[in-house]
């Protein structure tokens, strides 16, 4: 789970979806059904349940990462909102899915997983023949390069980007005051990371080569929130980074993730 969620245990559970489960066909965001979690067994029995279940909220950066992967892989799934404002993530039912009381958690048949990056890699490997090839199964060198940039995202980019998004975006949502000194420090750190990205993207269209991979996808949630802030200049001032962001943000799968936030 990302730094934003770690610091915001009540991270945005939209009231409009608090008591509902969404069934999605990843081919179209307009093709989904809503059933109340309180509905009777007779009414719910008419709904075909997806084998993949995601427990989370669409505004969560970590949940967004998993949802984007599901859409890229063209997989049907069921999104089960977790009412974090009511403390559902700390209740026994959710702790059985994620003992740390965080989101998201994923169920695929009899398999239960937590930690968003572990979930996305599982989906990319397990469903390698479906949808986009997010991890190369043919070339060990490409796969190794993808793994390098997956680590870079998790160890270098996200710790700074997520904390910066917390300062720039989420503090305001929760009536907290942005710390200008923290913003300055985090932007300084992120600039150095993005300088490395600029050099890398001068050599290849995407981080792991000429194809979109999980390494690119993992960046989308934090970037999405920062693009709406003054920190956008960090990306815009680097031509290759800016071009890369435009490409990955324009993917249909990502548009569906953003649409979910409006449901």
UniProtKB/Swiss-Prot annotation:
Residues 1-49 form a transit peptide. The gene is GSTF8. Its main location: plastid. Pfam families: GST_C, GST_N. This is Glutathione S-transferase F8, chloroplastic. Gene3D superfamilies: 1.20.1050.10, Glutaredoxin. In vitro, possesses glutathione S-transferase activity toward 1-chloro-2,4-dinitrobenzene (CDNB) and glutathione peroxidase activity toward cumene hydroperoxide and linoleic acid-13-hydroperoxide. May be involved in the conjugation of reduced glutathione to a wide number of exogenous and endogenous hydrophobic electrophiles and have a detoxification role against certain herbicides. Its EC number is 2.5.1.18. One of its GO terms (biological process) is toxin catabolic process. Belongs to the GST superfamily. Phi family.
């Amino acid at each position: 789970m990302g730094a934003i969620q770690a610091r915001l245990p009540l991270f945005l559970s939209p009231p409009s979806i608090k008591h509902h489960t969404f069934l999605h066909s990843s081919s179209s965001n307009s093709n989904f059904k809503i059933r109340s979690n309180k509905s009777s067994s007779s009414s719910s029995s008419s709904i075909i349940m997806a084998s993949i279940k995601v427990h989370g909220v669409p505004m969560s950066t970590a949940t967004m990462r998993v949802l984007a992967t599901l859409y890229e892989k063209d997989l049907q799934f069921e999104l089960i909102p977790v009412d974090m404002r009511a403390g559902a993530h700390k209740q026994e039912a959710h702790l059985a899915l994620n003992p740390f009381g965080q989101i998201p958690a994923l169920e695929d048949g009899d398999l239960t997983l937590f930690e968003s990056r572990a979930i996305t890699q599982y989906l990319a490997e397990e469903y390698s023949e479906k949808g986009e090839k997010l991890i190369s199964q043919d070339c060990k060198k490409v796969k190794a390069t993808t793994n390098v940039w997956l680590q870079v995202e998790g160890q270098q980019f996200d710790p700074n980007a997520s904390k910066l998004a917390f300062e720039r975006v989420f503090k305001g949502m929760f009536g907290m005051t942005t710390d200008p000194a923290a913003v300055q420090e985090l932007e300084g750190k992120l600039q150095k990371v993005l300088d490395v990205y600029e050099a890398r993207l001068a050599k290849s269209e995407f981080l792991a080569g000429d194809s979109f991979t999980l390494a690119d996808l993992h960046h989308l949630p934090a970037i999405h929130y920062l693009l709406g802030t003054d920190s956008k200049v960090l990306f815009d001032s680097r031509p290759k980074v800016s071009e890369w962001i435009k490409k990955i943000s324009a993917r249909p799968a990502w548009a569906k993730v953003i649409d979910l936030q409006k449901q």
